[in-house]
């Protein structure tokens, strides 16, 4: 049986000094025989998805200690992508993922913790903690802060979210009063933004990976039911420690739970629910930490056979995460996928011996358990608040309509191909990604004229100045992991295209990425990126580009000889923006750019380069 990792710092005469320090934190003699559980919290007052997490660590800690463990809490950083967006702050968002992963590794390894409870929520925090967990490979469970309630206003017949506020603000016909009303109403409570944006997508995927409890991705931050997830996480992590350290059962380790098949399950769910394209980036990064051969080829294969079973904002205005929960949450989507033969259900999870057992217990269409049905009736109260567990509103009924409801069966899918696709072609030899769930079917094949911008800032100025016309394909380059650096999100350009009435008349291609709030024909992650010699850097104003989603292709319509001639010319000039960019690139960002890979590798550090630099 493996020894507790913490024994390194708690046993032996030579550790008297370390024990003295442990005692100064409150530990007693009997505690040195127990597992030390690291609680990786991410509370901050900067981020609405994390503003309510201040007391969550101690809530979990008390339950850990009741169950026989020793809990020690620390915090990671957390960047709010929405607040950081539209200015140089967005350069720091993706690099913060690596900082979060490293900080968890540093704290856990420096103090020899035996297991981790990851309290995450928003865009880069869940992926960063996931990367660290798979890197460390010790018992772990994820419990997130939960989704925000959708906003309500008399000026709109549908629920509001952050994107609605951005779009209306860019609409020159909207009055200041209307903009102010949307702004005040769009984000009414604590929690991660209310649609199927990156944060909620990733929290849902932790359920499919087997590393979180059912309801983790969908139970509202404000609802009293969510408290039980935190309490259960505290009990579960101690049990996972017992199984591994006392019973020598390594099936509970994250690399054995989140194995290749589990990554396929997570991606299958992502495609079926039309999740954010950022999830592809983060799953690729996490797979590398787990040393799993999972790449865009696998995602491309899955995208061709998995139907879209769920549509949520920003892909449709009718539904938000509160509606997904009412329809049975993630385990009901998994149940439909399993019935369609699209899941590996023989895999372990942190809460069930197999995923099949979990689905049987938690899919509302399979179980008669009234407690499960009551749990999924938890709904929004419509009261602005920053307080967790502050309301206990319930719907009168569940949404179990699998023909026309929020969650559909395979037979009644929104579409027989899923909500994400990988495109290849001479403009993106290593691939690029598009959220097809947000693309009108009429423009799944689109040929247009390239309109080149060498930064997001210049693209925004150009769109607002009406330089972009119907039929254009906006190309924003040198915004990849190296070129940005930091691979900015392009929510403002896509939102402004919509506000200009060009949402169905234009496309956008970038080596940057998109917010989970993006919809429209928005293609990101073009790899290799321009700064790494990618062909997106060879496109010129007015070039014809053909996008063909059904055939999974994207091509610059010039011949090979012309492409080769342009490449030779660009090699002489150097792969950098033509226009100067008033952008301060700090030492921290330069360090990230030096080691960053393109998006097809998850924008992680180049480990081969690192091994050369530090053998």
Curated annotation (Swiss-Prot):
Pfam short name (any one): ILVD_EDD_N
SUPFAM superfamilies the UniProt entry points to: IlvD/EDD N-terminal domain-like (SSF143975), LeuD/IlvD-like (SSF52016)
Residue sites binding [2Fe-2S] cluster per the record: 122, 193
Associated pathway: Amino-acid biosynthesis; L-isoleucine biosynthesis; L-isoleucine from 2-oxobutanoate: step 3/4; Amino-acid biosynthesis; L-valine biosynthesis; L-valine from pyruvate: step 3/4
Cofactor entry: [2Fe-2S] cluster; Mg(2+)
EC number: 4.2.1.9
Domain of life: Bacteria
GO function term, MF aspect, one: dihydroxy-acid dehydratase activity
Any one Gene Ontology cellular component term annotated for this protein: cytosol
Keyword Lipid metabolism: no
Enzyme class: lyase
Cofactor: record remark: Binds 1 [2Fe-2S] cluster per subunit. This cluster acts as a Lewis acid cofactor.
Secretion signal span: none
GO BP: isoleucine biosynthetic process; L-valine biosynthetic process
InterPro entries tied to this protein: Dihydro-acid_dehy_C, DihydroxyA_deHydtase, DiOHA_6PGluconate_deHydtase_CS, ILV_EDD_C, ILV_EDD_N, IlvD/EDD_N
Swiss-Prot/TrEMBL catalytic activity: (2R)-2,3-dihydroxy-3-methylbutanoate = 3-methyl-2-oxobutanoate + H2O; (2R,3R)-2,3-dihydroxy-3-methylpentanoate = (S)-3-methyl-2-oxopentanoate + H2O
Alphabetized UniProt keyword annotations: 2Fe-2S, Amino-acid biosynthesis, Branched-chain amino acid biosynthesis, Iron, Iron-sulfur, Lyase, Magnesium, Metal-binding
Residues annotated as the enzyme's active site: 515 (proton acceptor)
Residues the entry annotates as binding Mg(2+): 81, 123-124, 489
Modified residues (N6-carboxylysine): 124
Role description: Functions in the biosynthesis of branched-chain amino acids. Catalyzes the dehydration of (2R,3R)-2,3-dihydroxy-3-methylpentanoate (2,3-dihydroxy-3-methylvalerate) into 2-oxo-3-methylpentanoate (2-oxo-3-methylvalerate) and of (2R)-2,3-dihydroxy-3-methylbutanoate (2,3-dihydroxyisovalerate) into 2-oxo-3-methylbutanoate (2-oxoisovalerate), the penultimate precursor to L-isoleucine and L-valine, respectively.
Family: Belongs to the IlvD/Edd family.
Assembly: Homodimer.
UniProt protein name: Dihydroxy-acid dehydratase
